[in-house]
Amino acid sequence: MKLAVDTHTHTYASGHAYSTLIENARAAKQNGLTLFCTTDHAESMPGAPHYWFFSNQRILPRFLEGVGVIRGVEANILNTQGEIDLHPSVDHNLDWVIGSFHEPVFHPADKAAHTQALIETIKGGRVDALGHLGNPHFDFDFEQVIACAKAHNVAIEINNSTLKGHSRVGSIDRCYEIARVAKSLDAYITTGSDAHFCLDIGGLSLASQLIDEVGINPQRVITHTARQFLDFLELRGRQPIEEFAGLL
């Protein structure tokens, strides 16, 4: 499946990534993306940027190198109450919020705790997608969580970096099963490279392969076209982004 949007990318501001936003935009252009989301880690991750970094994203231009820039964050799920490490005052300056588990922030517990945390995060209404869910350290009830995500219009991320097999080892089979459950429940799917270096921006071939093999309806893959992604943001209650009105 052709994918026009990469919804999970990092700059060197994350503390363990190595490229600038301009470098990422150039790579996005070279790789044929229409839009990309810049989603540095929120402040609870070691080395992550300060609150102001996210609050000030309103100054970012809507296009860099001819590619649309979606202002975002990868927030950390903090606890079983579904709290995330992003002050609510930042929300109106961002277009896209991923909620993810990371071991340095949320210590792996048990399946019930992870399931509760994900469900409460969804119900909290502040995240647009759940990131890299395949991690076996954070097992959860696939059916319960994805059904809740479907009910609240929260997308399930297929993470290309995970599918390489080098990070979150043991995730690949789980990613395929998560995708199959998402297909059966007609949930929304998003795709992210999780790039920590510019040459990986738009690298979504393994995510695309998974989508094709599982047979997910392109209409449920919000990154299939820029318009599908922008329509999803509006479905989530975001205001239309005027500069992107002409994107297809």
UniProtKB/Swiss-Prot annotation:
Pfam families assigned: PHP (PF02811)
Entry's EC annotation: 3.1.3.-
GO terms classed as biological process: bacterial-type flagellum-dependent swarming motility
Binding positions (Zn(2+) 3): E74, H102, H132
Gene3D superfamilies, per database record: Metal-dependent hydrolases
Positions annotated to bind Zn(2+) 2: H16, H41, H196
UniProt cross-references to InterPro entries, sorted A to Z: Phosphatase_YcdX_put, PHP_dom, PHP_phosphatase, Pol/His_phosphatase_N, Pol/histidinol_Pase-like
Alphabetical list of NCBIfam families matching this protein: PRK09248.1 (NF006702)
Protein name from the UniProt record: Probable phosphatase VC_A0894
Upper lineage: Bacteria, Pseudomonadati, Pseudomonadota, Gammaproteobacteria, Vibrionales
